[in-house]
Structures are given as C-alpha cells and as structure tokens.
C-alpha cells in the first residue's frame, strides 16, 4: 500500500463490483470502469486491475465514455519490483512536480508513449529499451526515491529493458526478458542485502485476465 503498485485502483474495482453484487446485480467491466473513473478521476489504475494485460485508455472528449484497448503483454517479459521500506505521501509526490513543463519534454513523453505501445505490440525489446525513459515526473521524484538512481547504476551492465518508478513510487519496476531474469534478480538480492533497511523484492509476471 502507498508505494505505487496500484492498490487504490484494485480497491476501487473490488468495491464497485461488491456494491453491484450486494444489490443483486452483475456489473460489466464497462460499468466498473465508468464508476471507478468517476471516483478516481482517471481510468488507468482501475483499468489495469480490471482487465489485465497492457491497457491503453482514456476519456472521450465528447462525454464520459472510456475508450480503451488491450494489448497482449509478451510472455517472456518479466517484471521485478523493488519495494523500499517506506511509503510516499501523495502530497509530497505532487509537490515536487513543476507547475509547467518544457514543451520539448512534453513532446518527448508523447512520442515515447506511442513507441512503448509499439514495442509491446511488436514484442520488440530493443525498441522498449530505447524508449522506456521519462522526462515529466521521474527527474523530479527521484529525489524522493534515491534507490532509483542507485539501481540504474547497479544494473547498468545488465540486459534489462528499463528501470523505472512504479506509479509515483516508492516501488521501482525493472523490466527484463525471462532469459536474463535470474542473473538480474541475483544482483538485486546482493544489493538489497547491503541496505540498512532491506527492501522487498518481487518476482512477477503480468496478469492477463484481470478481475
């Protein structure tokens, strides 16, 4: 909880389903997503828990309709997560963000968003490695999660696709092909054991079914 792993989205999806069930109704995924977006303000977190795989979604400009598309996540792309022994307050995470961003940074992130979708759709590791870079929030939030910069250095010689914040943090996500996972995980264990407060390490696969 409170470390960027989507617990709020999962809780909302479960609560909406339960509210329908207790009234003798069976909600569709569209029902849950629509109500969940009204509660959270945006659909991404609820959609991820609800639908599984990789979800690209947004709100229609004309009404409250949610437009979403599901992409098959490559089976061999595994997710390692480092969870530090602290949580981040939402207000603190937001305070470090600038009120305005450079035009070129916004454009760079828009380009990379499209290219990340292409990398998943094409199962292209080289492309993912090249584009899994953020210029809108990580440069500011890494001061709150110093482990991010440290792990990027620790893993710089390993064939990972990326090392990024999970949500706003404090959890850190490492994307790696299954064939390299064990060696990367071993390096993470060595690093974790050297820390004053040993972080948790999660060895995960992407859920493909959702709720």
Language-model region placement:
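Short acidic/polar active-site loop segments enriched in Thr and Asp
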Residues: 161
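Short acidic/histidine-rich active-site segments
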Residues: 165-168
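Short, solvent-exposed polar/charged micro-motifs at secondary-structure junctions
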Residues: 1-5, 210-211
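A short, flexible beta-alpha/helix-coil linker loop
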Residues: 1, 134-137, 170
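Short, flexible active-site loop motifs that bind/organize anionic cofactors or intermediates
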Residues: 2, 22, 83, 171
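DPxDG-like acidic metal-binding loop motif
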Residues: 3, 7-29, 50-52
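Short beta-strand->loop micro-motif that forms the acidic, two-metal-ion catalytic signature
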Residues: 171-177
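ATP-dependent small-molecule kinase catalytic core of the GHMP/sugar-kinase superfamily
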Residues: 26-158, 178-211
């Amino acid at each position: 909880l409170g470390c960027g792993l989507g617990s709020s989205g999962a809780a909302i999806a479960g609560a909406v389903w339960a509210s329908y069930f207790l009234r003798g109704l069976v909600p569709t995924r569209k029902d849950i997503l629509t109500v969940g977006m009204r509660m959270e303000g945006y659909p991404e977190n609820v959609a991820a828990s609800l639908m599984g795989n990789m979800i690209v979604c947004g709100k229609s400009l004309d009404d409250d309709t949610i437009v979403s598309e599901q992409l098959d996540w490559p089976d061999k792309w595994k997710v390692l997560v480092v969870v530090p022994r602290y949580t981040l307050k939402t207000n603190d995470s937001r305070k470090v963000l600038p009120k305005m961003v450079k035009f070129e940074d916004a454009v760079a992130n828009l380009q990379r968003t499209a290219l990340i979708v292409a990398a998943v759709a094409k199962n292209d590791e080289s492309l993912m490695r090249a584009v899994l870079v953020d210029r809108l929030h990580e440069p500011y939030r890494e001061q709150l999660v110093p482990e991010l910069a440290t792990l990027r250095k620790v893993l710089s010689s390993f064939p990972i696709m990326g090392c990024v914040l999970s949500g706003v943090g404090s959890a850190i996500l490492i994307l790696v092909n299954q064939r390299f996972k064990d060696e990367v995980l071993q390096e993470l264990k060595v690093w974790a054991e050297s820390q004053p407060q040993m972080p948790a390490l999660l060895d995960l696969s992407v859920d493909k079914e959702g709720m």
